[in-house]
Amino acid sequence: MAGRRCPQDSVRPLAVAVAVATLAMSAVACGPKSPDFQSILSTSPTTSAVSTTTEVPVPLWKYLESVGVTGEPVAPSSLTDLTVSIPTPPGWAPMKNPNITPNTEMIAKGESYPTAMLMVFKLHRDFDIAEALKHGTADARLSTNFTELDSSTADFNGFPSSMIQGSYDLHGRRLHTWNRIVFPTGAPPAKQRYLVQLTITSLANEAVKHASDIEAIIAGFVVAAK
């Protein structure tokens, strides 16, 4: 992708946020790349196997941008009105990647897969959360040869949420992904709205091997008001 980097701490359209998952997965497989403007909130590749005869899902970032929402990436540990965290299983460690903003928390087991990536965005401008949740799984469904295992739109710790799990093809490999987005609201009087996204990715043929670690991360994922 042709690169265009935005200031790391400025407010930016959510497209910059949502595609970081794709960049992170691509970078793990292929080495550093320069992200473009759209490339930080989408979990799907730029091409997909969705038939043109069916209605193509609209990605979350595209919906949010269409209603004028912008997002400011913030470090999970810097939040004063929310607790957002994931555990680090034994053998996992923080992973640095030039394609990922410093405010993104990423851990991995070894130098490749599996990985877990946690992102938080402070959202600006009001929007319909129920409508946004309809687009919460679109990026995954647009992935090449995506096969869904399960999904849910049940609340997470009392906050609106969407989850999807499945497998897809990327750079000649079959990957397994678990992805949850949460729209928490901070404490009054500000009642700041956020987008939290956790994406866990492994090689599909190693998903069982790493299942206990992945389940521990999912079980220990916290999004809670302080």
Curated annotation (Swiss-Prot):
Gene expressing this chain: lpqT
Domain of life according to the entry: Bacteria
InterPro entries: Lipoprotein_LpqN/LpqT-like
Record keywords: Cell membrane, Lipoprotein, Membrane, Palmitate, Signal
Signal sequence interval, chain numbering: 1-29
GO cellular component: peptidoglycan-based cell wall; plasma membrane
Covalent lipid sites (N-palmitoyl cysteine): C30
Lipid attachment, kind S-diacylglycerol cysteine: C30
Keyword Signal attached: yes
A Pfam family this chain is assigned to: Lpp-LpqN
Membrane topology label: Lipid-anchor
Subcellular location: Cell membrane
The protein's name: Putative lipoprotein LpqT
